[in-house]
Amino acid sequence: MIQTQLLETYTVPDYQTWKGDWELIYGQPLAMTPSPGVLHQRISSAIHAQLFSALEPCPSCEVLFEIDVEFTAETVVRPDLVVICYPAQGDRLTRAPELIVEVVSHLRSRRDEVIKFDLYQREGVAYYILAYPEARKIKVYRLSENVYVKVGDFFDERLRFELSKCSFDFDFGSVWPKANPRS
């Protein structure tokens, strides 16, 4: 006889009491350790800087670093970057961003490539961007008829993004740090 072990599920009020950095996906807690390394931070900062600059002429949209996004009573995630085109209120977002960026580490690649891919697609995030620092590659997905369609793999090309309230060009080549920065 096969016995099924039921996993305990948690909710946002539980999540709010936890110490440390966690995400809660479909009621399951997932630790966000170890913290992002130097290369991860450089890539994330470069993407943030470019998005910030690109969105400056568009007062309806803004880019935010590592903010909690509460999709349901059992799901709260903290993407590396999000772009929203609605007024943010409170300490977390409770509506889907239009664009999410995750800088992928080998330790959490399954979470970003499978679990969050499905979650963001289901929740209606228009663009999902996965940055791979070691490969110096960025994958871009766009939601089309409720399904992510791969726009492409980008290394140093440019791409135009069309959000609900603005559009902008993004230069993927400017994301990658130069050899031996600040040395």
Task: Give names to the regions the model predicted.
Residues 1-183:
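Gly/Pro/Ser/Thr-rich low-complexity, intrinsically disordered segments predominantly at protein N-termini
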